[in-house]
Amino acid sequence: MSRTVFCQNLNKEAEGLGFQLYPGEIGKRIFDNISKEAWTIWQKKQTMLINEKKMNMMNVDDRAFLEAAMVAYLFEGKEPEIEGYVPPSK
């Protein structure tokens, strides 16, 4: 049976992640409070951000920017700024 969490991003009970996908304290926080559905949505936005801003994941500054955008999106509900992208209305 899969575990459920109260997803802070979607504000509902949903299936949790199978294991901690991100290292450290932020990873633990994501594992405990973010659903599989919300993580999948974030991964799509993350890909758009990386491509739009031509980020290099070997660059420390790019990784720090992406981590800040991830925390802002998952826990504060802030949409990342992706040029030309209009989020679907709820």
From Swiss-Prot:
The keyword Zinc does not apply. This is Probable Fe(2+)-trafficking protein. Could be a mediator in iron transactions between iron acquisition and iron-requiring processes, such as synthesis and/or repair of Fe-S clusters in biosynthetic enzymes. Gene3D superfamilies: Fe(II) trafficking protein YggX. GO terms for molecular function: iron ion binding. Keywords: Iron. It comes from Colwellia psychrerythraea (strain 34H / ATCC BAA-681) (Vibrio psychroerythus). The lineage of its organism: Bacteria, Pseudomonadati, Pseudomonadota, Gammaproteobacteria, Alteromonadales. NCBIfam families: PRK05408.1 (NF003817).
